[in-house]
A protein has these predicted regions:
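PRPP-associated nucleotide enzymes
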Residues: 1-237
Length: 237
C-alpha cells in the first residue's frame, strides 16, 4: 500500500491500511483511535488538532483515550505568486518559517516582499486574537509531561507541523506522536525523525488535496470549531 518511491523506513514505522478514501473525518479518526488506544489508553495524553478538519479527526481519538482535545491555531502567510507558504503565525504571535524553504530563499523573499509579509503577519495575528481571545485555547502547562498526539486531517504541507514543533520546544513531553489519516511522502520524509511515533493510515506519492480523500466535507465553521474546543477544555478542567 506504500508508493514505490517511498523511503524504505516508511513500511517500518507507519501502520498503513489499504483504505484510500474515508467516508468522513470522524470515521478516519475512529480508525486511528483503534490503533492509538492499544498503546496509549493508560498514558497521560493530550490530543492537539492542527486545523478545523483535524478537530473532527481528533474527537473520536480523545473520546477513546478519555483525554483532553485542544487545537493549535495558526494562520498561513503565502508567498505572492508562488502557491507556497512562507510560514505561519501561531496564537502566541510567533512566526515560524516553513522548513521546506532554504535560508537563501527566505532571505530573497524577505528582501523582495518585506513590507507585504509584515502586514500579512499582523493581519494573521489579529485574526487569531479575534477568534480565540487573549487567553487562547492551548498553553504549555496543559501539555507538560504528557504524551502529545498532534492530529491532522491530511499532511500535505509541513508548515502546520513546523508551527506545532516550534510551540512545543519549551515543553517537556513524555512522547510526541504525529497522526493523520493521509499524508504525502515528502511530509512523512521530513517528520519521521522528530516524532517518537507516527500513525498514518495512507501515504500518497501524489497528494491531491485533503478534501479529495473524504466523501463528506461538511465541516463546521472556524468560529464553531473554536467554540467547541473552548467548551471541551472548560468541561475537562
Amino acid at each position: 500500500c506504500y508508493p514505490e518511491n517511498a523511503p524504505r523506513y516508511i513500511s517500518d514505522i507507519l501502520t498503513c491500511s489499504m483504505t484510500m478514501y474515508f467516508q468522513s473525518r470522524h470515521e478516519a479518526g475512529e480508525q486511528l483511535a483503534v490503533q492509538l488506544f492499544e498503546k496509549y489508553r493508560y498514558e497521560n495524553t493530550a490530543v492537539v488538532a492542527l486545523s478545523d478538519g483535524a478537530v473532527a479527526v481528533g474527537e473520536p481519538i480523545a473520546a477513546k483515550l478519555h483525554c483532553v482535545l485542544t487545537m493549535l491555531v495558526s494562520e498561513d502567510v503565502a508567498i505572492p505568486g508562488e502557491g507556497q507558504s512562507l510560514g505561519a503565525v501561531s496564537q502566541e504571535g510567533t512566526f515560524t518559517y516553513s522548513s521546506e524553504l532554504e535560508a537563501s530563499e527566505i532571505r530573497e523573499y524577505n528582501t523582495e516582499f518585506h513590507g507585504y509579509f509584515e502586514e500579512k503577519k499582523r493581519e494573521a495575528f489579529h485574526k487569531i486574537n479575534n477568534l480565540i481571545g487573549d487567553g487562547g485555547i492551548i498553553d504549555h502547562d496543559m501539555l507538560r509531561e504528557r504524551t502529545v498526539i498532534l492530529i491532522s486531517d491530511g499532511l500535505s504541507d509541513i508548515t502546520p507541523l513546523d508551527v506545532a514543533l516550534d510551540f512545543l520546544k519549551p515543553v517537556k513531553l513524555a512522547r510526541l506522536v504525529i497522526a493523520a489519516p493521509v499524508a504525502s511522502v515528502d511530509v512523512v520524509d521530513r517528520v519521521h525523525m522528530v516524532a517518537d511515533e507516527l500513525h498514518i493510515l495512507d501515504v500518497k506519492a501524489n497528494y491531491l488535496g485533503t478534501d479529495h480523500y473524504y466523501e463528506q466535507n461538511d465541516l463546521p465553521t472556524h468560529e464553531q470549531t473554536i467554540a467547541k474546543i473552548n467548551q471541551i477544555i472548560l468541561n475537562w478542567r
